Structures are given as C-alpha cells and as structure tokens.
Amino acid sequence: VGTYYLATVEGDQPRVRPFGTVLIYEGKLYIQTGRKKAVSKQLAKNPKAEICAFKDGVWLRVAGELVDDDRYEVKKAMLDAYPELRSMYDENDGNTQVLYFKNATATFSSFTAPPEEMQF
C-alpha cells in the first residue's frame, strides 16, 4: 500500500502523521491505530479526518468521519493483512483500534486532469 498521511484536529491545531495500514472490509475503508495514541484521543473528540496519498502524479484525498469498530473480526482481518504489526498489537489486547470512513468523499487530483470525486 505504501504511506499516506492522516490529518486530525487537536483543539484548534491540525495534526498530521504518516500511516501505512488500510483495509477494505465489508465494503468499508478501514485504518488502524492504537487506543493509547494521541490520534485515537483526537478522533474520539472530533471524528472528522482526512487522509492524503500520492502516487505517479496523482494524489488522493479522503475526507469524512472515522467510526470506531471494536469487533474482533475486523481487528483480526487488519492484523492478518499486516502481520508485522503483531509484535505491537493483538486483536484481544484492548489497545488495537480499527476505524472506518463514514460520510466520506474521495477526491483524485492531478496537474493534468480535472479532479474526480466519489462519495461513500
């Protein structure tokens, strides 16, 4: 998948950090983090977030609300997709957090074509 950047808000200050986990599960776009991290606390206060990725001259932005999904099955699916995370996370550890985008807009942009948008 590569790296993308997740933006959240802490008070009135934007916060951006690199992420690398992404999973389509039951037709929803999921990301993963740890409940102990600042990003988890920021999303609990304000679930609006945006991710941005760039590849081959095209950038993708996905903006929406991130919804916590505490089901064992989706946490296991995420960790099975990224086995290297098992040294830090486990679906039963109480720390592993998976979230999916809701009321989201994906925008594909480049310098050579008009932006394309889709809602999901």
What are these regions (language model features)?
Residues 13, 57-58:
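Short glycine/serine/proline-enriched coil/turn segments at secondary-structure junctions
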Residues 22-57:
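A short mixed-secondary-structure module that forms the rim of ligand-binding clefts
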Residues 5, 29-30, 61, 107:
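General beta-strand recognition
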Residues 18-20:
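Conserved beta-strand in the GNAT
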Residues 1-12, 49-52:
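A short, Trp-centered hydrophobic/proline-enriched beta-strand micro-motif
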Residues 61-120:
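Charged, gly/pro-rich active-site loop segments
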Residues 1-2, 45-47, 102-103:
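A short, compositionally biased
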